[in-house]
């Protein structure tokens, strides 16, 4: 038997599928979500929400107060797209060259709007609902900027929830994990400086490219020799930018790294070792290495009690077979900044399907699975009515 909430929401499913596809056609990257945020604000205003714009530039918060309840619930969706070219071949594919909703944030935004319309119309809760539409998740600091701009000072929350669609998991299955669920992320640049010169007389130079290669190799010892094998960590040198000519020894190299961990102490150890190794390796060649921490986000940790509520609501809506535990993974999510401020919160996944030909996120052929809109909206509504009762 279908749950009554699903039946009530299904009436408007086609409307929100169409909205999701319109968002998909007009993708906007981090901190440039002007058209998206304007449409979000317009719809929330039409449905009776108090609308606030401007946090983190393009962020939107919609507030709905119902009854005399004192509790305050936050639901968050991300809005930004990726700087990628889409190759899905869908009729609603991106109309913006080099911009693409390749992670499903068009679907996340629409899912929360789908729930917002129902909750404002039915109003079967008592308390304050804060709907948070966040920019720049793909940059991994849009959430941090919203918090720094006073998100929780202006819009207090006693609990907060976020979700993400997940290709590779069974369709509609809710994935939960207590504690550490997603990795911290740190982006670092290492600038190596040596002495340039002609490739025919290397004895008069300090080869910055050679130094960068030694640093790259030495960094791989961190995970295998400085970190216990029981704690996952990743150190990846993703870019080494040196010269262009075959007969010139470079005096300057820029290295770009990413670091992922599931433990803050491990994170600190890895970052310190990167610094120590880079500086020492450079000095051994009479070069210098300067490190810059470009940005970082913390480990995403879920509160077990709040997770239990998600599990309870999801089981009632979809059945126990559609709720399960997931392993932690080394991807990162800046919703972690919000959970860091408000540890009574939960981030969960919704399976987008595990067919062999289903594209993963960040793949040029990816498209959000519209079947998830109803699932996600029902879960948002169920959580709201459960928490604010």
Task: Report each predicted region and the residues it spans.
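Metal-dependent amide/peptide-bond hydrolase catalytic core
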Residues: 210-389
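Acidic/His- and Gly-rich active-site-bordering loop/insert found
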Residues: 2-101, 106, 110-113, 117-125
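Active-site beta-loop-alpha junctions enriched in small/polar residues
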Residues: 28, 78-80, 136-138, 166, ...
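Non-cysteine beta-strand/loop elements that form the S-adenosyl-L-methionine
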Residues: 74-76, 188-190, 346-352
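Divalent metal-coordination and catalytic microenvironments
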Residues: 23, 62, 75, 105, ...
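A structural signal for isolated positions on well-ordered beta-strands in alpha/beta enzyme cores
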Residues: 52, 130-132, 290
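Short beta-strand-to-loop capping motifs
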Residues: 64, 192-194, 259-261
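Histidine/acidic-residue-rich, glycine-tolerant segments that coordinate divalent metal ions
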Residues: 60-61, 82-84, 88-100, 106-115, ...
